[in-house]
UniProtKB/Swiss-Prot annotation:
Gene Ontology cellular-component terms listed: cytoplasm
Protein name stated in the entry: Elongation factor G 3
Keywords linked to the UniProt accession: Cytoplasm, Elongation factor, GTP-binding, Nucleotide-binding, Protein biosynthesis
Encoding gene, per UniProt annotation: fusA3
Any one Gene Ontology BP term: ribosome disassembly
Coiled coil start-end: none
Amino acid sequence: MSRHTRIERYRNIGIMAHIDAGKTTLTERVLFFTGRIHSVGEVHDGATEMDWLPQEKQRGITITSAATTAFWQPRQGMGAGVPHRINVLDTPGHVDFTIEVERSLRVLDGAVAVFDASQGVEPQSEAVWRQADRYNVPRIAFINKMDKVGADFAMSVASIQARLGARPVAVQWPLGAGSEFRGLVDLVRMRAVMFDGEDGSFVDGQAVPEAVRAEVEAQRLRLIEACADEDATVLEKFVDGRLEDITAEDLERALRSGALARTLVPVLCGSAFKKKGVQMLLDAIVNYLPAPSDMPAVEGFVPGKEERVSRPVSDSGPPCALAFKLMSDKAVGGIVFLRVYSGTLRAGTVLLNPATGRRERVGRLMFMHANRREEVAEVHAGDICAALGLKGVRTGDTLCDPAEPVVLESLGVMEPVVQLAVEARSPAELTKLEDGLHRLAAEDPSLRVGVDPESGQVLLSGMGELHLEVVVDRLRTEHGVEARVGQPKVAWRDTLRRQVRQEYRHVRQSGGPGQYAYVVLDVGPAPRGAGLVFTDDTRGGTIPKELVPAIEKGVAGAMARGVRDGVPLVDVEVRLLDGDTHVRDSTPQAFAVAGSLALQAAAHRAGVQQLEPVMEVEVTTPEEYLGEVLGDLAARRGRVLGMEARGVVRLVSARVPMASLFGYVTGLRGRTQGRAQASMRLGAYEPVPEALQASYAAEARA
């Protein structure tokens, strides 16, 4: 069966922003204007389509990315008059749920970055922008909340350039702001669009008001200058001084070219809540963001080889898909979200999972609308879908044709910063607790579940207090487990203080087959954030190449277990210098043990340095509370990096140890009568000051 929509009419997009910038509200309006829903729900009422988890409705925030599909026929531009399929992922804005943004951006072709017009670029909007940079995702920007007090379009655009290093290009200019926001000027066509009422209706084709004509013409000249850098036709007309000959089609072609090359970012404006500017944004999604066929062929490598291969977008190519999200459903079991890069999948298609070596048979295929399902017979290259029947698949796994295997780039791993202990209230609930945590950890790669080696307690590690609070709440609501929960603690790390050379000989002669392994390692600290840097510097084949991965595996296992109090060891450089084998007793298992014990012995000799997570904090506060905010940050061992005025408030940037930040946001609201706000994200792991190491080491053992 052929696809219903041609691939060039697909748009796979995400909506991303800082918390409270209006992502979910914008998504609701997109669904409304595309006819996907017939009435809009509001975030503050807990009635939105895309925030379907009970925790999302209760808290008024997005926790998990939600997928849906809509169709839009642009009024104008290159896609005018032709229905386009838009697959939308609405992503969280809270830093604790940044893994949802990470995995969404990994599989999307384009994104809409939403900014609060009164704030411009905020901390988490900067974080998600960097994530989009990592995956080379083309973007357009939507300056939202133009009807809000303090809205400033020019400031917001300037902040995109100053803080994100991007080249924002305004394709619209607002007429008024705050309560006076009444319309906008389409700079591409040089005509005004006046909003008419609260239902999203507008009057197009109006003359540009004389009061703003000079400013608007200056902005259009900037637009033309930016487009001249992207398109030869625009450049020729611009250089010749024939500005009146530059058509809307010329500018749209240049804007699309620049957006796809990520050399510029088209910027639009509006008010999602008031339904203003949303239809023009939908036109821009079609006209400026790429189809799957516009993107480079996805690349991977052949399992077990260094050979790079590509998979062009083609329905007739070998099936290739990436599992980017898992979800449990009581009615149907495990649901695996897939981005199909090539080929066609049907119920019964057999796929290889190179990560496990297992073959998986596709059960049913579905398109999702939040938590609702639409079953389909087949899916094609470019589709974002969900599948049942895939038993052994994890987030980040590739599923491919067994005859033409390939492994695609997986997802980035995020280091947790907070942990807490949980335990079942009764022995009868222990199995339910373990099963529930196993399912939640399978869904959420940023959630780590471990066991305290001394107390035997189950430890949850995550991205923040709210993250773990939601996990515990989901244990109760989805798995029926009322767990006892300890106080949140810092997720400490250790690293090595100095470099040492370590020999280790592992010999076992009794109790079954013999084991023999001898290794000589050079072990020392690696640059911060490097993880394990392992190199094989042996000469003359003293250790066969097939045994070297076992040594690395043993070293990695010892680092994960840590050398004191179960605290993981990070950022270690290991050079394998020499070794020895026995013709019969030298097995991969023996060398894994030798690598593990050699690393532990080296760490005890080198000494360990305790590391703590240090957060990048931004506080927005009225001027009258600035002194109190700064004093409190200093008392928490914070280092103020800078301050800037944002209208009537001050923005304070600081780096503060996570150990000093438990309960900070709640306390800040109390001290400022609810008028100050704070956000934070992990900056880096840094050494604990010598004066605090003894007390923090005791806390790590507690």
